[in-house]
């Protein structure tokens, strides 16, 4: 699993959620048609995005959850020739890339963090990115809690068990 952070120059006031959606569209345009189709067909998206900004910069954070996503996205994003991100929509349509960083975490290390630490019985879940799910062939932009937990379980299974199966009875 890898996290790629693209730190870019901010020229305009932006909405982090809207820019994440626009970035997702840009990413779907730069990857192969075959992989884009795989992402649309699969139940678990091995990519998650987050956008955060301060007064002068915008950071696009890409979390790549499996080897396939890493092999498809990382060479395109980390290519030295990629100096700007040009979006079709959004408040700021062009972002000059100031810095690129990659962080890698092995499944073993994530397991250690996940299982070795004492955990509270109560967790606070803060959703900081747009949340939409495809169900019955349509996108649902305001999902219910069951769909959100199903997605979390699928991502867990994708990372640790190499399967997308979820125990629906558990939900």
Please name every model-derived segment:
Residues 1-171:
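RNA-interacting cores
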């Amino acid at each position: 699993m890898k996290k790629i952070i693209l730190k870019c120059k901010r020229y305009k006031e932006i909405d982090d959620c809207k820019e994440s959606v626009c970035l997702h569209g840009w990413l779907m345009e730069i990857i192969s048609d075959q992989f884009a189709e795989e992402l649309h067909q699969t139940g678990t998206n091995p990519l998650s995005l987050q956008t955060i900004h301060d007064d002068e910069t915008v950071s696009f954070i890409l979390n790549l959850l499996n080897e396939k996503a890493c092999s498809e996205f990382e060479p395109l994003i980390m290519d030295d020739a990629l100096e700007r991100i040009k979006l079709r929509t959004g408040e700021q349509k062009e972002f000059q890339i100031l810095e690129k960083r990659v962080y890698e975490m092995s499944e073993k290390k994530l397991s250690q963090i996940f299982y070795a630490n004492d955990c509270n019985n109560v967790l606070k879940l803060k959703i900081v990115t747009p949340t939409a799910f495809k169900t019955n062939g349509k996108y649902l932009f305001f999902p219910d809690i069951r769909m959100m937990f199903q997605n979390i379980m699928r991502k867990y299974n994708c990372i640790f068990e190499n399967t997308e199966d979820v125990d629906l009875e558990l939900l």
